[in-house]
Amino acid sequence: GELEIAQTIQQAMLPKVFPPFADRLDLNIYGMVRPAKEIGGDLYDFYVRHDKLFFCVGDVSGKGVPASLVMATVRSLFRSITSHEEQAHVIMRQMNDALSDSNEQNMFVTLFLGVLDIESGELHYCNAGHNAPVLNGEMLPVLPNLPIGVASGFEFQPQTTTIHHNDLLFLYTDGLTEAENTRHEQFGEQRMLQILDQQRGERPRHITDMMEAEVASFVGAAQQSDDLTMLVIRYQTDAILMRNDIQQIPTLAEWVEGLSIPMELNMPINLALEEAVSNVMLYAYPGRNDGKVYVEYVETETPEGKTLVFTISDSGVAFDPTQTPDADITLSAEERAIGGLGIHLVRQLMDEIRYERSDDKNILTLVKRV
């Protein structure tokens, strides 16, 4: 019935392929909408044009099919206007004028819109009454513009900031902060910021998964009353993309050399990565050497010290190296298969190792605390 229609419209409009830019090492993005029982009109969208990332997150006032139709309109306005305009506040003004003039439903939309210059890190943004995004654990300053769809001709104020290497931008709708438990307490900004702080070095997908799990356990038996939407953008990580060819291992070592890793950790980390990556190269793509292996590095600092997080991902056959038995270390080096010491060694060298199968990918995360 109506619920299915609204849900179909909403889901059809959202980007679904993650990671979205397989050939780009400078952006890692993940987005999700978890629809409520009665569909709201939450949306997110993003794409790259001329080395600029255009992105938005919005929330339509209202529920059901009318809200999802407005959401679809907003998304197509975003796509058509950004195809020829690059200034965030001008895009917002044009979207607002178009929506206000044709707004029979009298619904308004809170929207955050950003245009990121991928080369320079310059972020031009405009906020139309939406929740402030979180940049590296701090709320991004936003001006109190009107939501769109309220008043044609409104002049939106632009804002600018610069984001840097490894920065994390977290966008969301109020379905997150206003999620209520059975005692009518809200999840709130403090909890959200605390979780973001704990997950700072993680992949965007991991961050949304953790946040969603925390919200679910907070809400408990209460019914989810609003869509839950998140968009996470990690900018310019240190990353390397390799073919699954053992000959490529030396390029991995060169890459590690170039990272700002404490000198005394260079050797153990190199060794652990070499073992883990050669494992992937040997098992993930049987009989093929056109597979890809992607390694990403993020360093975060907390009062307790530094955390170094390496993520190794591939699209090969499902294979969990953490389940392989430890190597027989009584054998001589010649008798052991290459990568055979593998996971035993990685466990010794790193503080944490975990595997997940997600979006048809093997993802192995190695963590070292300094």
Cite the ranges covered by each PLM segment.
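… and, occasionally, acidic/histidine-rich disordered N-termini of signaling adaptors
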Residues: G1-F170, G220-Q248
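Conserved polar catalytic motif of the HATPase_c/GHKL fold
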Residues: D174, E274-E275, N279, Q348
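Flexible, glycine-/charge-rich segments associated with ATP-binding catalytic modules
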Residues: E214-R243, R347-V370
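Conserved short strand/loop->alpha-helix "switch" segment adjacent to the catalytic nucleotide/phosphoryl-transfer site
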Residues: A253-S278, E334-A337
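Short active-site segment of divalent metal-dependent hydrolases/proteases
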Residues: G62, T177, S278, L282
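C-terminal catalytic subdomain
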Residues: H164-L171, L176-A239
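Conserved beta-strand-loop-beta-strand hairpin that lines the nucleotide-binding pocket
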Residues: M281-V370
